[in-house]
């Protein structure tokens, strides 16, 4: 037996360790298990039981709302942007060695000092201050500047976030050119299982392309855990995007009347592609875009579950050089990944969104003569077409 001074320490009080109720001398005798009293182990056991019940409850909840299991969901929510592609299942977009087109180097150009946060700093310091992982300049089809930071390299797969929206639009544009769909087609005419009996049924492909559907799923939500319960954050982590859309068809405005940037629109375009072609968005993108531009590396597109649907609004991942190949092909017309008509559609602002910037068919227009593919965490494919 060992002795331990009473935590209560007063005569006549109930002792929490030995539960004496008559007279407490301030000293207890107890039989230790290892080096801890029985009460400590009881407390640990109770806490463990509570945690197991809590985890089981959360696990059951994630199954009901089609979310990853709790630990996976927390890892995804807290991960830095560059790590998220590996935390969700994905489909491969396969590069073809036979179509690989090596980059040529042009005359090297230096980037001058820039104004950032009210100060003039070197461009290298700017890249570091903005946590940039890769930066390239392509001029006249040749690389004139290329820099990698934070341990990244030419072969590093980087997430695009909403740059993926324009990638999805390129496939939609080809389907329109082929006469397989029209911009005037209603979404539910292609996927009738989503009919809601409301103005949702009037939403057209054009509405989706120009962020003008009126579907009430906002992209405005708090960062961090406080925003995880918001609808658009839910679809990012969802293990069943069809289930998610079925439960998020509420309309905020009439279609075509109130343009606002909402990622749900692009997700619906992705579902259209899979329904019309009978193939995954990844497979269509491989054949229509990736191999024709001569991509060097395989890319990935995150999906809701293995063999499921791509998250068309966000989750395309590739190397910096291969992103640049898509941008260069779209600008030069070689290889042809967009018809003249679709390039005009992409380049002609249809509505005004945030900051008064123009927007059309999943492409931003911040200034005249500029086409911009823009991702949430500072991903850009910036085209000066003037």
Where are these regions (language model features)?
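Cysteine-centered motifs
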Residues: 6, 15-18, 24
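Active-site SXXK
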Residues: 141, 158-184, 208, 269-273, ...
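Flexible glycine/proline-enriched surface loops and loop-helix/loop-strand junctions
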Residues: 153-154, 249-255, 265-267, 305-312
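Active-site helix/loop module of the DD-peptidase/beta-lactamase fold
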Residues: 159, 177-216, 220, 250, ...
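Amphipathic alpha-helical interface segments
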Residues: 225-236, 247
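Conserved active-site loop region of the serine DD-peptidase/beta-lactamase
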Residues: 279-297, 309, 313-383
């Amino acid at each position: 037996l060992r002795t331990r001074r009473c935590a209560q320490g007063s005569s006549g009080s109930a002792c929490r360790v030995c539960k004496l109720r008559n007279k407490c001398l301030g000293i207890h005798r107890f039989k230790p298990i290892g080096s801890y009293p029985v009460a400590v182990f009881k407390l640990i056991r109770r806490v463990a039981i509570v945690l197991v019940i809590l985890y089981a409850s959360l696990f059951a909840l994630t199954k009901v709302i089609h979310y990853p299991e709790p630990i996976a969901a927390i890892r995804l929510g807290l991960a830095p942007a560059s790590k998220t592609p590996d935390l969700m299942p994905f489909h491969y977009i396969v590069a073809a060695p036979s179509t690989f087109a090596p980059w040529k180097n042009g005359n090297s150009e230096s980037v001058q000092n820039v104004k950032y946060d009210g100060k003039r700093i070197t461009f290298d310091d700017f890249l570091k201050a903005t946590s940039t992982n890769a930066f390239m300049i392509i001029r006249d089809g040749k690389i004139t500047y290329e820099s990698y930071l934070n341990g990244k390299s030419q072969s590093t797969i980087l997430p695009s976030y909403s740059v993926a929206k324009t990638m999805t639009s390129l496939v939609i544009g080809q389907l329109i050119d082929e006469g397989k769909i029209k911009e005037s087609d209603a979404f539910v005419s292609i996927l009738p299982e989503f009919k809601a009996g409301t103005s949702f049924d009037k939403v057209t492909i054009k509405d989706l392309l120009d962020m003008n559907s009126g579907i009430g799923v906002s992209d405005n939500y708090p960062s961090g855990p406080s925003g995880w319960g918001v609808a658009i954050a839910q679809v990012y982590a969802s293990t069943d995007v069809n289930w998610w859309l079925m439960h998020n068809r509420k309309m905020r405005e009439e279609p075509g009347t109130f343009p606002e940037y909402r990622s749900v629109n692009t997700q619906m375009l992705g579902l259209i592609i899979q329904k019309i072609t009978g193939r995954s968005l990844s497979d269509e993108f491989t054949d229509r875009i990736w191999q024709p531009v001569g991509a060097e590396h395989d890319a990935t597109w995150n999906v809701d579950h293995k063999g499921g649907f791509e998250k068309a609004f966000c989750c395309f991942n590739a190397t910096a050089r291969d992103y640049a190949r898509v941008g260069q092909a779209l600008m030069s017309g070689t290889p042809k990944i967009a018809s003249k008509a679709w390039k005009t559609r992409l380049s002609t602002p249809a509505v005004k969104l945030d900051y008064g910037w123009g927007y059309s068919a999943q492409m931003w227009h911040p200034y005249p003569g500029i086409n911009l593919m823009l991702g949430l965490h500072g991903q850009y494919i910036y085209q000066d077409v003037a």
